[in-house]
Structures are given as C-alpha cells and as structure tokens.
Amino acid sequence: YRELRKALSKYMNGEKQAKVPALIKPIRIPSFQFTEMAPLFDNLPAAKKDRNIRTMEEYNQGFGSILYRTTLPEMKTPSLLTVNDAHDYAQVFLDGKYIGKLDRRNGEKQLEFPACPKGARLDILVEAMGRINFGRAIKDFKGITQSVELTVDIDGRPFTCNLKDWEVYNLEDTYDFYKNMKFQP
C-alpha cells in the first residue's frame, strides 16, 4: 500500500494525498461455546426436478451454492465418478457420507467411487467462489456445467453411464435462506 502511494505521488503534480488512516486496534473475542447447529442437508429448500444437469444460471441463481441429488443403480464394484465441470468447488457424498472433493483450481474432475446398492443417494454440493471476468475463462457459469458420469469396468472394458434425473436445490447465500433453518442442539 505504501509503495503504491509513493509511486502514485510522482504523478500528482504537487497535490497532497489523503492521510493514511490510523491502524484499527485488534479486539479480543472471549471464548464461547456453540450450542446449536443447523445441518445443511436437514434444511434444504424445495427441490427442482430435472432430467439433465444445468448450471446455476439456468435456475436463475447467480451466487451461493447448489446441490445436485440423484439415485444410483447398483454398482457391484468401485467405479470412477467424472464431473464435467464443477465450477468452482464440489463436495461429493454417497448416502450422506463424504466421498471426496473436486476443486476446479486444481483441474480435479474425477473421484474413485465405491460400490453401492441400488437406490443409493449421490449428492454433489457445488460452491460458486466468485467470477472470472477476463480471458479464456470469461464464460464462467457456476454449478455443474455439462454432465456427471460413472465409469465401471465390465469384463475388462470401460462402460460409462451419464447420470440423469436430478433433484436440484438452490442454496442462495442470503439472510432469507439462513433465517428459516431449523437448529438443533
């Protein structure tokens, strides 16, 4: 900050810069205990049903998070989950259990996925983390932008299934969303 001020002063033709404000003294926050919580999956808004994956913008949502949910066929062996593409950060859950994360910044698109029974619930929670407004990435849609696939090995050959029939939960980061959450001890 100070170096930038010094550099700018060369071009101010004698004008004086505003004074640097005094530093704000840090405060001490006393320790405290959390007494309640509001689990996200217990506080979801009404779902939108959709055959195909769509971005946040296609659901008229510009920020926050979005949860994609579907049920799976029986997977007798582990498979490979591919999310094309999660913008920006996705957490993957199978029947409520955390499986892993996909981070766009690291180019992550795939996770090893465990075997599961028919009807197991797949949840993909995608968080939008700001907008890119320049260069190649200016088309910066949020959520899942293309598809979700499971690839399983059958008799030595890969078989890929494009998952369909989604329940979609728009989780806008607003006071109205949070004020209606049901808290529990």
Regions from the language model: what does each represent?
Residues 1-183:
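Carbohydrate-binding surfaces of carbohydrate-active enzymes
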